[in-house]
Amino acid sequence: MALRLQMLGTGGAFAKKYFNNNALLYAGDFTLLIDCGITAPLALHTIGKSVEEIDAVLITHIHGDHVGGLEELAFRRKFGSGRKPILYIAENLVEPLWENTLKGGLSQDGVIHSLNDVFDVRLLKESEPAQLAPELKVELIRTPHIPGKPSYSLYINDEIFYSADMTFEPELLMRLVRERGCRRIFHEVQLTGKGEVHTTLQELLSLPTEIQSQILLKHYSDDMESFRGATGNMDFLRQHEVYTL
């Protein structure tokens, strides 16, 4: 059965027209939430999805537009079904996620004092594919974003690249397509300005046509519509639409 992708949001961190760049990945009867940003709970409500319909969450890196909704998710599950959400995460993100992001809101003396007390934490290792469900395999690929802050893009079922926030890595993209059989690329984009911590549209336009033709763009700013027709062989992902992969 083919995978399906539904972006809860396609916006950059400061976008207001679009929700945070988070996604639902459907693999058979398994639903994975890729990142859970500040707007994720509202986006789920908007498309009529309950947190109870999410089988697991995977976090790519620690910024508010990717983890800011985890506190609400944890509390809604705690006071709903009572089931801990399954959380897939790189080992080196566990401590900063708890200590720097979630501890203040979720900790409770004598009851909750670690990430494991509120989530069913399942560690992922960089470059080691993990079978998350019968029809879903995910490999973490570390990609540059903020110096000193780990960030992981995803290689899904040995054929789909889903970028985290990242600076331009043309060699990686070409290697995935030409050597590893990648056929779809969901890539973040910064439409204007210098790409200090993101990949710019101009950088992506420098890629060979064969690579561009496999790219759908996400994590864009509110002026996205004015760039229609100016993205070469690439197109924009639309939030809430379901894409068969």
Curated annotation (Swiss-Prot):
<feature type="binding site">
    <location>
        <position position="66"/>
    </location>
    <ligand>
        <name>Zn(2+) 1</name>
    </ligand>
</feature>
<comment type="similarity">
    <text>Belongs to the anti-Pycsar protein Apyc1 family.</text>
</comment>
<feature type="binding site">
    <location>
        <position position="165"/>
    </location>
    <ligand>
        <name>Zn(2+) 1</name>
    </ligand>
</feature>
<keyword id="KW-0378">Hydrolase</keyword>
<feature type="region of interest" description="Beta-lactamase-like">
    <location>
        <begin position="19"/>
        <end position="219"/>
    </location>
</feature>
<comment type="function">
    <text>Counteracts the endogenous Pycsar antiviral defense system. Phosphodiesterase that enables metal-dependent hydrolysis of host cyclic nucleotide Pycsar defense signals such as cCMP and cUMP.</text>
</comment>
<protein>
    <recommendedName>
        <fullName>Anti-Pycsar protein Apyc1</fullName>
    </recommendedName>
</protein>
<dbReference type="InterPro" id="IPR036866">
    <property type="entry name" value="RibonucZ/Hydroxyglut_hydro"/>
</dbReference>
<dbReference type="InterPro" id="IPR056308">
    <property type="entry name" value="Anti-Pycsar_Apyc1"/>
</dbReference>
<feature type="binding site">
    <location>
        <position position="61"/>
    </location>
    <ligand>
        <name>Zn(2+) 2</name>
    </ligand>
</feature>
<dbReference type="GO" id="GO:0046872">
    <property type="term" value="F:metal ion binding"/>
</dbReference>
<keyword id="KW-0479">Metal-binding</keyword>
<dbReference type="InterPro" id="IPR001279">
    <property type="entry name" value="Metallo-B-lactamas"/>
</dbReference>
<dbReference type="GO" id="GO:0016787">
    <property type="term" value="F:hydrolase activity"/>
</dbReference>
<feature type="binding site">
    <location>
        <position position="145"/>
    </location>
    <ligand>
        <name>Zn(2+) 2</name>
    </ligand>
</feature>
<feature type="binding site">
    <location>
        <position position="63"/>
    </location>
    <ligand>
        <name>Zn(2+) 2</name>
    </ligand>
</feature>
<keyword id="KW-0862">Zinc</keyword>
<comment type="subunit">
    <text>Homodimer.</text>
</comment>
<feature type="binding site">
    <location>
        <position position="65"/>
    </location>
    <ligand>
        <name>Zn(2+) 1</name>
    </ligand>
</feature>
<dbReference type="Pfam" id="PF23023">
    <property type="entry name" value="Anti-Pycsar_Apyc1"/>
</dbReference>
<feature type="binding site">
    <location>
        <position position="219"/>
    </location>
    <ligand>
        <name>Zn(2+) 1</name>
    </ligand>
</feature>
